[in-house]
């Protein structure tokens, strides 16, 4: 009996321990995980870190009240240290080398980490100011260009109106010139018809004159007995009177033969009379 009782008690204790362990696991599963512990330095914004490390420099002994021993170590940058850091920053905009940081910290009586953080915050502020300055310059340029674009739009609109007016005037002028050209063409055609009739009348007059010349008897251009012939001047006058040159009759000599009296010299007229 004692053995059985001891075994039963051990079983009961084991069951109690198992339930307790199971309850602990369930309780741990239901509980949220603990929040991670974040250092107070990481919770501060980047721009406030400069002010924090300004209290870590060596200078006046202004301790923060209500912070115990931690506040006793906080000091503020002196004006001389700030001027030295400002001059070094304006001289070297780039990131300082570790050797330069250590040398500057030793000269100012600061820690290299304080100098590095001060330069980091100073560069951040300088970049933000530079961005603001660049934005202001770009904004002014944009406003100037926008006003210029608006003025150009107004000029374009005015030029478009002027172009439309000039096109209307040109179209009206072309219409007027087209009407005047038609009238001029009609007048020229009528004048051409009148001149054609006049030319026909002139041709008729010339033909009548030629017929009159043909009706006239041909003048005696040569006199054989007196050995005289018509001069070229007389021939030209007769040719001027008639537009068309007339042929001589068969009983007369040609003009070229009469115009050269030298051809008659070797022909003695006496022999002709003797023969007759």
Curated annotation (Swiss-Prot):
Residues 70-130 bind DNA. It is found in: Nucleus. Residues 129-173 are annotated as: Leucine-zipper. CDD domains: homeodomain. One of its GO terms (biological process) is positive regulation of DNA-templated transcription. Residues 182-197 have a biased composition (Low complexity). Belongs to the HD-ZIP homeobox family. Class I subfamily. This is Homeobox-leucine zipper protein HOX22. It comes from Oryza sativa subsp. indica.
């Amino acid at each position: 009996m004692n053995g059985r009782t001891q075994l039963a008690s051990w079983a009961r204790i084991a069951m109690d321990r198992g339930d307790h362990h199971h309850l602990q696991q369930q309780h741990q599963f239901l509980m949220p995980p603990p929040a991670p512990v974040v250092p107070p330095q990481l919770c501060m914004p980047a721009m406030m870190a400069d002010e924090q490390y300004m209290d870590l420099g060596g200078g006046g002994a202004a301790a923060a009240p209500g912070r115990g021993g931690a506040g006793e170590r906080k000091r503020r940058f002196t004006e001389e240290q700030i001027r030295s850091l400002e001059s070094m920053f304006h001289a070297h905009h780039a990131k300082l080398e570790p050797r330069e940081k250590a040398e500057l910290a030793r000269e100012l009586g600061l820690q290299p980490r304080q100098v590095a953080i001060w330069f980091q915050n100073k560069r951040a502020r300088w970049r933000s100011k530079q961005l603001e300055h660049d934005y202001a310059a770009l904004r002014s340029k944009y406003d100037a260009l926008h006003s210029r674009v608006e003025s150009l739009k107004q000029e374009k609109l005015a030029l478009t109106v002027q172009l439309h007016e000039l096109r209307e005037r040109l179209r009206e002028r072309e219409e007027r010139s087209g009407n005047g050209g038609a009238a001029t063409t009609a007048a020229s055609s009528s004048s051409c018809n009148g001149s054609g009739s006049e030319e026909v009348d002139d041709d008729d007059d010339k033909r009548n004159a030629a017929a009159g010349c043909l009706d006239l008897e041909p003048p005696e251009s040569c006199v054989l007995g007196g050995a005289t012939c018509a001069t070229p001047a007389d021939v030209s006058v007769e040719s001027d009177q008639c537009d068309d040159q007339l042929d001589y009759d068969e009983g007369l000599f040609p003009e070229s033969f009469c115009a050269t009296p030298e051809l008659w010299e070797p022909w003695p007229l006496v022999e002709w009379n003797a023969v007759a």
